[in-house]
């Protein structure tokens, strides 16, 4: 009896949905499609090479067995990638144009005692997937399902408030659901350093090492703060090696890629880069709206679509800022007993699209710190390549974040001519259109400038 390809694949999906866990099915199977069955070969199309490789490695036998049970005879399975969906490396937010389906994964069992370091809200079910974070989400789920097998280490990279910590802790929650006895350690780099200092002070280094090296999954947040801490880097290097050699999973999060962390030991940079570096970009409008919709659902509040659109359109930097705006809106409406309308929310939702008053001093400090040079170097007439490059980026960002004219920017950089500033700004503007790494660097520097400027703002 002949069967159409659509009917066959529908039956395959129906059976796999029962056989596999919901996260596995939603992430790896549901996004694939059967293209044709000919010459006893079933051709399956995946949205990207990442998904293809994962299916080939872990699920091709399962799929083949299900197809055989339906057709009554064995068939060869060939998995390929949809045309035009080639894998892009870091920064390729637009490369992952999968159907936007926000799978609802099971919330962790509330009866078990979780690690107190893990936020109960940071689970896969509450993470909204979009083109900006799809690769990081898929990699995190893969690690959660099979730690130590692929992507070890997994290095999550992205600006402030984009979901790195959420994904890391979701991995921890998911592992505990599968294996409650797993030793899941989530720690910030600052806490790792503090524990190390305490161990040295108390002469308990052996206990410190045994503790961290006993982890089944080690989740380390904000690794960029390891810069300049030589002894911390030394200890983390050996901890990393011990876990990796034992097949244990290491997940690291940072606001920048390993090769952009100043004063990071080369051997650590090499190890951080040996797995998968998954970049998370700022969410697009559709994803921001989905985030607001999901958060309102968890808060059991119905938001008018125009309110969602207004908040999503005006709060664009990161998820933390977006959710903060929603929280302020809900509090304001609740306190004053007003209808939920854009007009009523206008007084409390002062949009951050206004240019933050970044000072030239703050920008110079951030640039100097990032490129490991001094502010005096930036203001000097040195033509050394690294100083000249940092100076050009600084001029470009000062133009972006202040209202200073080209001559005034030149003055801030030690009295440079306005034509020098103009040339630098034009050069960086042209390069950023084709250099994804530079674009990411500029975003990260802009985030730091904004944070630096906020911290310098006097209290009212």
Swiss-Prot record:
Residues 1-73 are annotated as: Domain I, interacts with DnaA modulators. One of its GO terms (molecular function) is lipid binding. One of its GO terms (biological process) is DNA replication initiation. GO terms for cellular component: cytoplasm; plasma membrane. Disulfide bonds: none annotated. Keywords: ATP-binding, Cytoplasm, DNA replication, DNA-binding, Lipid-binding, Nucleotide-binding. It is found in: Cytoplasm. Domain I is involved in oligomerization and binding regulators, domain II is flexibile and of varying length in different bacteria, domain III forms the AAA+ region, while domain IV binds dsDNA. PANTHER family: CHROMOSOMAL REPLICATION INITIATOR PROTEIN DNAA (PTHR30050:SF2). This is Chromosomal replication initiator protein DnaA. It comes from Trichormus variabilis (strain ATCC 29413 / PCC 7937). The lineage of its organism: Bacteria, Bacillati, Cyanobacteriota, Cyanophyceae, Nostocales.
